[in-house]
Amino acid sequence: MAIVGLGTDIVEIERIEAHVARSGDKLARRVLTEAELAIYIAHSQPSRYLAKRFAAKEAAAKALGTGIGRGVSFQHIHIGNTPDGAPTIRFTDGAQQRLAFLNGIFGHISIADEKSYAIATVILESC
């Protein structure tokens, strides 16, 4: 195994809360996939959920070396959870193409939050 990408992002949860208060679900609909959006809508702390997913997708885009744009969109990065609750990451479309370009085969992700911040780190590995 070799590491072919590493990205970290931190988000101030209050900024996401303020954005949601101003614009409703506009940011969520831009950032989240349909499956993630369904969880967001039903979540007891939707702004916190959105902040963690935003940080995770930004970290993934940094690990891919593109940021959001340049062929990779938020919609190409899917964040889920195992039955035990551990976060998972899956790439499609432009993000999958970029992962293949890097000879990457798998992404590892860690997401954490506390009162004010959400943070995520993504490591991409090759065989």
From Swiss-Prot:
Transfers the 4'-phosphopantetheine moiety from coenzyme A to a Ser of acyl-carrier-protein. Signal peptide: none annotated. SUPFAM superfamilies: 4'-phosphopantetheinyl transferase. GO terms for molecular function: holo-[acyl-carrier-protein] synthase activity; magnesium ion binding. The keyword Lipoprotein does not apply. Its cofactor is Mg(2+). One of its GO terms (cellular component) is cytoplasm. InterPro entries: 4-PPantetheinyl_Trfase_dom, 4-PPantetheinyl_Trfase_dom_sf, ACPS, Ppantetheine-prot_Trfase_dom. Mg(2+) binds at D9, E58. NCBIfam families: acpS, pantethn_trn. The gene is acpS. Its EC number is 2.7.8.7. It is found in: Cytoplasm. Its main location: cytoplasm. It catalyses: apo-[ACP] + CoA = holo-[ACP] + adenosine 3',5'-bisphosphate + H(+). Belongs to the P-Pant transferase superfamily. AcpS family. Keywords: Cytoplasm, Fatty acid biosynthesis, Fatty acid metabolism, Lipid biosynthesis, Lipid metabolism, Magnesium, Metal-binding, Transferase. GO terms for biological process: fatty acid biosynthetic process. This is Holo-[acyl-carrier-protein] synthase. Pfam families: ACPS. It is an enzyme of class 2 (transferase).
